[in-house]
Amino acid sequence: TSTRPAESLYTGRSVQDAKWVAQKLDAKLMFASTGLGLIGSEQPCPAYNLTVASEPNSIRPWLGKLGLHPSDWWDAINNHWQRPNPIAALAKRADIKHILIALSANYVDLVANDLAQIATNDRPKLRLFTSRPGIERLPEHFRSLAMPYDERLESSRLAGTRADFPQRSMRHFVELIAAPTDSSSA
């Protein structure tokens, strides 16, 4: 089976915006992969077609028949690769000061258990970018970490689709924090 770097398998505007953010911040780009768990953008991956979103290739119907949730799948796939709670493990690292996470509501469902494992003192490192439904699906004590983006982003130059909203809002946030300020008008 041939493999390619993860960043070449995932395409579309959402990935382009996430790549832009990683490059701008000189940060590591990672993907929440339904099939492979949390993976770095350079990780070799086989082509596959699996999602937690409401699409024909979704794992949701299969999980539902088993009485399981997407977060159970995330736990199992990461345990299979011997990387339990990989987001919590990153948050625990002292050398990592900031973690920006952009996920759709469906992918919030996927990583919810992992997020819940993040220690209280590591949570301030996080900034979460998701939709209003995504915020509602976050573990309750993480909702305050969700950046307050809403449909007003659609009237900006970063207008787009619901599917790429989390990554567009993350890009907007980074553009704002990275922009030089004019101290005379501040």
Locate the predicted segments by residue.
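A glycine-rich, hydrophobic loop/mini-helix early in the fold
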Residues: 1-52
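Flexible, charged surface loops at secondary-structure boundaries
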Residues: 22-26, 89-99, 119-123
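Long, charge-dense
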Residues: 35-89
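Short catalytic/ligand-binding loop motif for oxyanion handling, primarily in non-cytosolic enzymes
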Residues: 38-42, 108-111, 136-138
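Structural motif
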Residues: 102-106, 130-132
